[in-house]
C-alpha cells in the first residue's frame, strides 16, 4: 500500500489497517516457524506496510 493512499484515510481506518497487518504478520511468522511459508518476502512487505501505517498515524497525530 502506498503512503499517498494511507494519507487519505482517517485515523479509524488506519487503526483497522494496522490491526489487519499485525494479524497477517503473526500468521506469516507462524507459517515460517512451521516451515509452511514458501514466499518469505511477504514478511518484509508486511513489516514495511506496518511501518508506513504507523508513520502516517504519527504524522496525523502531530498535525493536531
From Swiss-Prot:
Return the HAMAP family for the record: Ribosomal_uL29
Gene symbol here is: rpmC
Q: What is the lineage of its organism?
A: Bacteria, Pseudomonadati, Pseudomonadota, Betaproteobacteria, Burkholderiales
Give the family from UniProt.
Belongs to the universal ribosomal protein uL29 family.
Cite the Pfam families for this sequence: Ribosomal_L29
Q: Does the keyword Ribonucleoprotein apply?
A: yes
Q: Which Gene3D superfamilies match?
A: 6.10.140.1970
Organism field: Burkholderia mallei (strain ATCC 23344)
PROSITE patterns given in the database record: RIBOSOMAL_L29
Record keywords, A-Z:
Ribonucleoprotein, Ribosomal protein
Sorted alphabetically, the Gene Ontology cellular component annotations on this record are: cytosolic large ribosomal subunit
> Can you say what this protein is called?
Large ribosomal subunit protein uL29
Q: Which GO terms describe its molecular function?
A: structural constituent of ribosome
Amino acid at each position: 500500500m502506498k503512503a499517498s493512499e494511507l494519507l487519505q484515510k482517517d485515523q479509524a481506518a488506519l487503526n483497522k489497517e494496522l490491526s489487519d497487518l499485525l494479524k497477517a504478520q503473526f500468521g506469516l511468522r507462524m507459517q515460517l516457524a512451521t516451515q509452511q511459508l514458501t514466499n518469505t518476502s511477504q514478511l518484509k512487505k508486511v513489516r514495511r506496510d506496518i511501518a508506513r501505517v504507523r508513520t502516517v498515524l504519527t504524522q496525523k497525530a502531530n498535525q493536531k
